[in-house]
């Protein structure tokens, strides 16, 4: 890895080597395309419910199970990435979620769709720990915060891409025959598999992981159970605050986005093309906000770069969710996203900096995706209160978003400051497990 200092006259984008750029691009591709495959489902839940004749809450259960299965995929992939390297699990995960989405698009029954999307969750969860470790270990220290924001914010680009596809392709596909609108959206999700060819040819393992693995082999010491290691006393508080942070993070995200399309269509009477506007531009702004606040973390620290935008964003929630005029809704919602869009900026960077190399992928994968399990409850709960309790979606979405943001800010405040931390190949966890 480059050791260029923060005061170097070399521009930050010239500091990384070609191999470091390739590693980062691989992680970026995996995450952005992962986002497309997952988020497109949020836009087509209503027509799926109509085609299979099931209540909307049962379709949201598909979304819930997909999120829960992410934890299984992340835990397995993290273990593989720490043992075998970051690259192979990344390729496996991309192939997995791509072909599961294809299978979902060809579903003959709702049960088949349910199973295909549940399996997709495994591949989706498996992508993040391998990709995040690959990117953050490869990247130079001085711009890691900014590039963490670019990487995680690219989920917004994937979501924007799915919104764009929905806005332009759903109607023409549906005109080919009833049901081909939502099926076509899912079938498009097989295209990310092509990225694996590029990763296989051009991407190398991070030097810090390679060196760490050599030391483990030389000393004949390995962390056999990395998931248990992160709950040892040395890392317990770190793991607890990280889990709380990610649980709140996922709840915020799905309180905002999970039922937004359904809310706009069913309660405000928007067309699919109209719904695509806030989804598309909101996610473009999410990418920009994530990149901006990630860059700010190099100046004001990791914690403040997350707490400030999220605390400010709370003020906008009751305003946009009590606005029915399309123009005002769009304006206030976009302003809200400028701040709340920064909440994910440091997911790859801060989680990677909190743990040593031997367990980094396992730790980051588990801490991040256990949050998805909590987030999985959001859509069914919102639907229950909106439909079964006749509250409509606006109030449940507002309460869930504000409450989760408050917990988010507290969790970040309790976490460690890691700005400028250098990732090394030293054996840290093994020294705890096997006393000298």
Outline where the language-model segments fall.
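Cytosolic juxtamembrane N-terminal segment immediately preceding the first transmembrane helix
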Residues: 1-36, 41
